[in-house]
C-alpha cells in the first residue's frame, strides 16, 4: 500500500482541497475502482491489458440512461435493462471474438481489444439515435428518492450516497467471489498457471467468460452511476480517459494485486478532484498528472521487478512475420523483373494523383501518406521489437511542434526542420520508453497511451504553452526550392515515404534489424549471443520516434499550421489498428493499412469514422493473422512457387516467422 500512501501525500501536499471536495473525489474514486478491478481481473487471467474495458459498459449505460431519460422508463427497470445488456454484450464479445484468440500471441489479443474498444464506441455513439438525440448527455438520470446534505463547499444528493453503497457492495462481492468461491479460486489458479490449469481439467474457457462478464458489469456500474453525478459526455476519448485512470491504478497495484488496485483508484479519484479544484480553468492538467503517476508506478515496478518479471514472454511476438524468398526463388528472371517493376508502377501511379485530384483531396492524400509514415514507425517498435506503442501520434505531435518552431519562428529550411523534428521526437520516445525497458513489452502500451493523452490534452496544446507556434506556415523551402502548392506538398510527402520504406528495407536486413526482430521471440537467447537488450530497445524507440517525427512535419505541411486535433490519442489508436490491419511486421502493411482504413475514414460521418478500423482489425486478424500484407506475401509465395515449378526448381516455402 506504499504507492497508495504516496499518491495521497502528493494530493495533500500539492493539491489540497476542502473536505467536501475531498469526499467528492472519494466517491468518484470508489466508482472508478470498479473499472480498475475489472481491468485487473482480465489482466490476471489473460495477461493482456484489455483496452476495451472502458467501453464494455458504455453502450449498455447509454441504453439505460436513454430509457430512463428519454423514454421515462422506471429507474430500476432501466438499470436492470442496462445490467442485462452489459452481461449479454460482454458475453457475446468474449465468445464471438476474444475466445477465437485464446491461443494467439498476446500482442494479437491486445490489438483485438483495441479494435473492440473502437467498435463499442461506434455502438455507443449510435444508440442515442433511437430517440433522435445526440448527444446523450442531455438525458437526466436521478435516483427516485431525492435528498441532499452539505459538506462545504459541495452539496451532495442521493445519487452520491447510492454510488457509495453500490461501489462498496460491488467491491465486497467481487472480493468474496474471487477469494471464497470455487470459481474465483479457479480464476486465480488459471491466471497463475494457465496451461497447467487446463491439464488439471479446469475449464479455462468458461472461467474466461465469467471473468469478462464480471469486468463488463463493473464497467457498466461505473459509467451508469457516474452519469447521475457527472453526466455522460460521450465522445471517442470518453472511454480512453476513464481507461487511463484505471491503468494508473493498475500500475500502482502491480497489475495483479486487486486490493491495492482498488485503493489506488480511490486515491486517484481524490487526486483528480484536487487537480481540478486547484486549477479549474485547466481541466486537462489532470491528464498530465495521471501520466506522471503512471510513469512513476512503472519506474518503481521496473526497479523492484524480479528476473522473471523482466523476461518478455515469447507469446508477445507476432505469429508468423514476413520472411524473404529463398535465394533460388530470388534468382528467377520473373522475380528479378517483377519487384522493381511493381514498385515503379505503384510510385508512378501515386505521382499522377495531383493531376486529377482537387485541393481538398490532395490535402487528405498528403495526410494519408503522413499516417503511412507513422505506421512505418509502429512496424519498427511493435512489429519488430515487440514494444507495444499506442502513442505514436504523440511522437508525431512532437515532430509537428518542432517543425512549426523551425519553419515559422526560425525560418529554417525544410531539411533542417525534418532533422530537428525527428531528433526531438526520437529523444522523447526514448524518455517515454525508459520506464519499460526491463519489463514486458506490454507495459510500453500503458506508458505510451498515458503520454498520448497528456500530450494531446495538455503538454502540446498551444493554448497551454505560448511557445508553440499558432500561425500559418507561409512558403517553406527545401534546399532553396519553394513548396508552394498542395501538389508539391503531396509529392514531398510521397518522397519522404519512399525514403522511409527504403531505409526500413535496408534496416531489416542489417544486424540492428535482425536484433530487433529477435527480441520478442526469446530475449534470453538474444542476450546469450551478446545482444544488449536494453540498448536494442532504446534503439527501437529512437528509430520509431524519429520516423514519427518526420510524419509530424508532413502533417504540419498538409494542414499549413500546427493543429493539436490532428494528433489526438484516439488517432494513435486508429493508426495502430490500421497498421495491424495492414500487417504489423511489414512496412507494406503500414501502407496498406493507411490506404484501406484511413482512406475509408475520409468518406464517413464522424460517428462512423472508427468503424473501419474497429471492424477491419477484428475480421482481418481472424482471417489473416499477419494482416493484409501477410495475404499479399502468401499470394506472392504461391505465384513464385508456380514459377519455380515451371523452371523445375524447388517449391517455395510459405512466409513464416523469421
Locate predicted features.
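Transmembrane alpha-helices and adjacent helix-loop boundaries
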Residues: 16, 28, 54-57, 77, ...
Amino acid at each position: 500500500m506504499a504507492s497508495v500512501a504516496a499518491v495521497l501525500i502528493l494530493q495533500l501536499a500539492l493539491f489540497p482541497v476542502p473536505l467536501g471536495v475531498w469526499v467528492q473525489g472519494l466517491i468518484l474514486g470508489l466508482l472508478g475502482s470498479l473499472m480498475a478491478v475489472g481491468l485487473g481481473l482480465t489482466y490476471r487471467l489473460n495477461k493482456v491489458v484489455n483496452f476495451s474495458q472502458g467501453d464494455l459498459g458504455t453502450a449498455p449505460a447509454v441504453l439505460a440512461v436513454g430509457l430512463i431519460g428519454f423514454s421515462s422508463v422506471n429507474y430500476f427497470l432501466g438499470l436492470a435493462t442496462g445490467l442485462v445488456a452489459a452481461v449479454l454484450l460482454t458475453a457475446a464479445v468474449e465468445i464471438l471474438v476474444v475466445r477465437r484468440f485464446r491461443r494467439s500471441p498476446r500482442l494479437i489479443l491486445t490489438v483485438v481489444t483495441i479494435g473492440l474498444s473502437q467498435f463499442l464506441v461506434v455502438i455507443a455513439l449510435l444508440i442515442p439515435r433511437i430517440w433522435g438525440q445526440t448527444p446523450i448527455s442531455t438525458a437526466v438520470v436521478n435516483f427516485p428518492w431525492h435528498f441532499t446534505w452539505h459538506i462545504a463547499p459541495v452539496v451532495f444528493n442521493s445519487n452520491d450516497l447510492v454510488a457509495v453503497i453500490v461501489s462498496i457492495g460491488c467491491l465486497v462481492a467481487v472480493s468474496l467471489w474471487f477469494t471464497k468461491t470455487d470459481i474465483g479460486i479457479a480464476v486465480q489458479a488459471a491466471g497463475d498457471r494457465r496451461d497447467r490449469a487446463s491439464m488439471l481439467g479446469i475449464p479455462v474457457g468458461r472461467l474466461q467468460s465469467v471473468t469478462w462478464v464480471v469486468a463488463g458489469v463493473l464497467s457498466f456500474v461505473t459509467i451508469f452511476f457516474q452519469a447521475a453525478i457527472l453526466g455522460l459526455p460521450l465522445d471517442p476519448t470518453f472511454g480512453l480517459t476513464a481507461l487511463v485512470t484505471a491503468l494508473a491504478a493498475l500500475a500502482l497495484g502491480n497489475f495483479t494485486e486487486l486490493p491495492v488496485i482498488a485503493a489506488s483508484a480511490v486515491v486517484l479519484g481524490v487526486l483528480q478532484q484536487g487537480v481540478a479544484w486547484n486549477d479549474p480553468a485547466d481541466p486537462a492538467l489532470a491528464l498530465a498528472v495521471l501520466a506522471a503517476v503512471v510513469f512513476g508506478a512503472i519506474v518503481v515496478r521496473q526497479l523492484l521487478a524480479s528476473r522473471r518479471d523482466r523476461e518478455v514472454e515469447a507469446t508477445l511476438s507476432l505469429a508468423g512475420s514476413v520472411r524473404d524468398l529463398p535465394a533460388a526463388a530470388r534468382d528467377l528472371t520473373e522475380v528479378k523483373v517483377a519487384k522493381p517493376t511493381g514498385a515503379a508502377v505503384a510510385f508512378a501511379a501515386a505521382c499522377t494523383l495531383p493531376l486529377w485530384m482537387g485541393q481538398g483531396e490532395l490535402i487528405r492524400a498528403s495526410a494519408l501518406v503522413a499516417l503511412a509514415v507513422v505506421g512505418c514507425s509502429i512496424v519498427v517498435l511493435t512489429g519488430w521489437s515487440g514494444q507495444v506503442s499506442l502513442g505514436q501520434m504523440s511522437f508525431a505531435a512532437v515532430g509537428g511542434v518542432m517543425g512549426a518552431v523551425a519553419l515559422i519562428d526560425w525560418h529554417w529550411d525544410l531539411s533542417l526542420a525534418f532533422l530537428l523534428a525527428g531528433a526531438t521526437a526520437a529523444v522523447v520516445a526514448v524518455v517515454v520508453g525508459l520506464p519499460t525497458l526491463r519489463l514486458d513489452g506490454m507495459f510500453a502500451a500503458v506508458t505510451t497511451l498515458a503520454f498520448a493523452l497528456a500530450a494531446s490534452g495538455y503538454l502540446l496544446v498551444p493554448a497551454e504553452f505560448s511557445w508553440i507556434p499558432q500561425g500559418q506556415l507561409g512558403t517553406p523551402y527545401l534546399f532553396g526550392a519553394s513548396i508552394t502548392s498542395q501538389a508539391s506538398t503531396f509529392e514531398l510527402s510521397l518522397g519522404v515515404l519512399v525514403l522511409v520504406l527504403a531505409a526500413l528495407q535496408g534496416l531489416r536486413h542489417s544486424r540492428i534489424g535482425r536484433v530487433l526482430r529477435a527480441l520478442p521471440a526469446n530475449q534470453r537467447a538474444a542476450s546469450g549471443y551478446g545482444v544488449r537488450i536494453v540498448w536494442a530497445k532504446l534503439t527501437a524507440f529512437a528509430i520509431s520516434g524519429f520516423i514519427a517525427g518526420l510524419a509530424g512535419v508532413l502533417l504540419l505541411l498538409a494542414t499549413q499550421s500546427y493543429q493539436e486535433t490532428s494528433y489526438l490519442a484516439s488517432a494513435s489508436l486508429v493508426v495502430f489498428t490500421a497498421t495491424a490491419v495492414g500487417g504489423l511486421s511489414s512496412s507494406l502493411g503500414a501502407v496498406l493499412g493507411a490506404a484501406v482504413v484511413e482512406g475509408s475514414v475520409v468518406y464517413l460521418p464522424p460517428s462512423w469514422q472508427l468503424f473501419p478500423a474497429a471492424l477491419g482489425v477484428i475480421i482481418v486478424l481472424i482471417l489473416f493473422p499477419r494482416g493484409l500484407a501477410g495475404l499479399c506475401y502468401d499470394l506472392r509465395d504461391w505465384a513464385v512457387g508456380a514459377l519455380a515449378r515451371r523452371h523445375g526448381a524447388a517449391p517455395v516455402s510459405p512466409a513464416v516467422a523469421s
